[in-house]
């Protein structure tokens, strides 16, 4: 269920401070974060945010279409390598 509109978007304060600092300085370096639960807000547009996926930080370039989504949606945590091949079919 989506979050109530009267509550507003959730964003971790430490991430918000990092984003505001990056916007002020105009720094193009990725903002590193472990906060996958934070929502993307308009001040993050045109920033690269490195979101942790459990193993490494995945760079995510924020565009206007992403506003309202969570950061974790753009950094997949699971890798699919395909099902095991059928040994009988391989021999033929």
Curated annotation (Swiss-Prot):
* Gene Ontology terms describing biological process: ribosomal small subunit assembly; translation
Q: Name one Pfam family in it.
A: Ribosomal_S19
Where is it found, in Gene Ontology cellular component terms?
cytoplasm; small ribosomal subunit
Q: Keyword Nucleotide-binding: yes or no?
A: no
Q: Which InterPro entries match?
A: Ribosomal_uS19 (IPR002222), Ribosomal_uS19_bac-type (IPR005732), Ribosomal_uS19_CS (IPR020934), Ribosomal_uS19_SF (IPR023575)
| Keywords, in A-Z order | Ribonucleoprotein, Ribosomal protein, RNA-binding, rRNA-binding
- What domain of life is recorded for the organism? Bacteria
Q: Which GO terms describe its molecular function?
A: rRNA binding; structural constituent of ribosome
Role noted for this protein: Protein S19 forms a complex with S13 that binds strongly to the 16S ribosomal RNA.
Write down the NCBIfam families for this protein, in alphabetical order. Answer: rpsS_bact
The UniProt similarity line reads:
Belongs to the universal ribosomal protein uS19 family.
Name of the protein in its database record: Small ribosomal subunit protein uS19
Taxonomic lineage of the native organism = Bacteria, Pseudomonadati, Pseudomonadota, Gammaproteobacteria, Vibrionales
Q: What is the name of the gene encoding this protein?
A: rpsS
